[in-house]
C-alpha cells in the first residue's frame, strides 16, 4: 500500500496489523513537513492541493508505530524528501526503524516538487538534484562505516560515530522515485529499485528499457500509487514489475478497513 497517514485517518498502529491480516505485505507513506500558505508551485496532480498534504504525519514516527505491532510488513517511505532533511539525523532515523522492525525498513527517496517548501528548509530548488545525491551518499557512509566522514559541495563533516547501524546488510534498500534520465542515473548510482509514481503500463515498458540500459542490470521496478484494476495489474506483471503499491485513500478506520478487504481480494491472484 501507498498512502498519506494523517491525524484524520486510520492510525498507523491499526493499519499495520490490518494489512498483515489481509496478506498485504508493504506500507509506504508520504512525507511533507509543512505546506506554505503562499505557494506558486503547481500541484503535479493538477487542481487544488489535496487536504492530506497539509496534515501528513512524520513518516518515521508513523512507521515505527506500525513496526511495533507487526512482524513481516515492509515499512517504507514513499518518498522521504531528502532535500529537506539533515543527512545525519536521517541516517539515524532509518537505521533505528530498521532496528526496531527487525530489518524491514525501505528508504524511498526523491527530490520533491514543492519549491516553496524546499526553500523553507534552506534548499535551493535549482540544485536539489545534486544536493539529494550527496545526502543519500552521506547517509550510506553513516550506515556502513564505524567512523564516517563526508566532504562534498553541500554535505561536509569530519569523522563521526553514528549508531545504530541498520540490521540489513549492507544497508536498507534505497528505492529511487522520479522519472527520466536523472532518476535512472540515481538508480544506477545507489538505488536498489526504481519507484515511479502511477505510470500507466502502456508507458512503463519503454521507460523500463531505458532504465535497464542505464543501469546495465535487470533493475527491479516498484510502481507507487498503481492503478487498482486487474487489467493494469496483469500488464505490470507481464512487464516484470516486482511490486505494485496500490494507493490507499486516507479515510477513517472503518472506511479504510473496508477498502483493504477489497484490495485483499484483488491481489490474492498475484501471490
What do the predicted segments below correspond to?
Residues 1-271:
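Active-site-adjacent structural elements that line small-molecule/cofactor binding pockets in enzymes
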Amino acid at each position: 500500500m501507498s498512502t498519506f497517514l494523517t491525524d484524520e485517518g486510520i492510525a498507523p498502529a491499526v493499519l499495520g496489523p490490518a494489512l498483515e491480516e489481509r496478506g498485504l505485505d508493504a506500507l509506504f507513506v508520504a512525507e511533507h513537513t509543512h505546506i506554505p500558505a503562499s505557494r506558486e508551485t503547481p500541484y503535479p496532480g493538477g487542481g487544488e492541493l489535496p487536504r492530506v498534504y497539509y496534515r501528513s504525519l512524520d513518516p518515521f514516527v508513523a512507521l515505527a508505530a506500525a513496526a511495533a505491532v507487526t512482524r513481516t510488513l515492509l515499512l517504507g517511505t514513499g518518498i522521504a524528501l531528502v532535500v529537506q532533511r539533515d543527512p545525519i539525523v536521517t541516517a539515524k532515523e532509518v537505521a533505528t526503524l530498521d532496528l526496531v522492525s527487525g530489518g524491514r525498513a525501505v528508504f524511498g527517496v526523491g527530490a520533491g516538487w514543492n519549491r516553496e517548501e524546499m526553500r523553507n528548509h534552506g534548499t535551493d530548488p535549482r540544485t536539489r538534484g545534486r544536493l539529494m545525491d550527496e545526502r543519500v551518499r552521506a547517509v550510506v557512509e553513516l550506515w556502513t562505516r564505524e567512523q564516517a566522514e563526508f566532504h562534498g559541495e553541500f554535505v561536509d563533516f569530519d569523522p563521526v560515530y553514528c549508531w545504530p547501524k541498520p540490521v540489513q546488510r549492507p544497508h536498507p534498500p534505497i528505492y529511487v522515485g522520479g522519472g527520466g534520465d536523472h532518476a535512472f542515473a540515481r538508480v544506477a548510482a545507489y538505488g536498489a529499485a526504481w519507484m515511479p509514481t502511477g505510470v500507466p503500463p502502456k508507458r512503463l515498458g519503454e521507460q523500463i528499457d531505458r532504465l535497464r540500459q542505464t543501469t546495465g542490470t535487470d533493475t527491479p521496478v516498484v510502481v507507487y500509487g498503481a492503478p487498482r484494476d486487474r487489467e493494469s495489474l496483469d500488464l505490470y506483471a507481464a512487464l516484470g514489475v516486482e511490486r505494485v503499491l496500490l494507493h490507499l485513500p486516507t479515510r477513517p478506520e472503518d472506511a479504510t478497513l473496508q477498502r483493504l478487504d477489497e484490495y485483499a481480494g484483488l491481489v490474492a491472484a498475484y501471490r
